[in-house]
Regions:
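Select subsegments of transmembrane alpha-helices in polytopic membrane proteins
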Residues: 51-65
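Alpha-helical transmembrane segments
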Residues: 2-19, 86-97
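Juxtamembrane "helix exit" motif at the C-terminal ends of alpha-helical transmembrane segments
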Residues: 65-80
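Short membrane-interface loop/juxtamembrane segments of multi-pass integral membrane proteins
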Residues: 37-54
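Membrane-embedded alpha-helical segments of multi-pass transporters/permeases
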Residues: 19, 70, 74, 98-102
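Membrane-water interface of transmembrane alpha-helices
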Residues: 16-34, 102-110
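Membrane-interface helix-boundary signature
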Residues: 3, 7, 51-54, 79-86
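Alpha-helical transmembrane segments and their immediate juxtamembrane interface regions
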Residues: 81-118
């Protein structure tokens, strides 16, 4: 049961956080969004582009976690598999966020260079 619950909560959280970023509803701030370099605060265009890309990554991560939650639901009575689902969920979340941070960091520098900020 724990694998299902954790996967589902993290999947829904990732999806909801990503949706707001994709639709560019989050204004530049220091609390919510991909603040990967100083350049995201120097231009609203860079902020929205980087956060839209990061939001897409969160949607993809959330979709993968939703699949894991579905599998965990099928095996809800197997405690060993539930533990494995928790591990897989946390591993995918961590790796996905690390990759997303690397990609959005590079994107912020590319956009800053294009705008003459770098």
């Amino acid at each position: 049961m724990i694998g299902f619950v954790i996967s589902l909560i993290l999947a829904i959280s990732s999806l909801l956080l990503g949706i707001a970023l994709i639709f560019r509803k989050v204004k530049p701030n220091h609390f919510y969004g991909f603040r990967v370099s100083k350049f995201v605060f120097k231009s609203d265009d860079i902020w929205y582009e980087v956060n839209a890309k990061g939001g897409m990554h969160l949607i993809i991560i959330g979709g993968i976690l939703m699949i894991i939650a579905s599998l965990a639901l099928v095996y809800i009575n197997d405690n060993i598999l539930q533990g494995i689902f928790v591990f897989i969920t946390l591993l995918i979340l961590a790796l996905g966020l690390i990759l997303s941070l690397i990609i959005t960091y590079n994107l912020s520098h590319i956009l800053a260079k294009e705008k003459g900020l770098k």
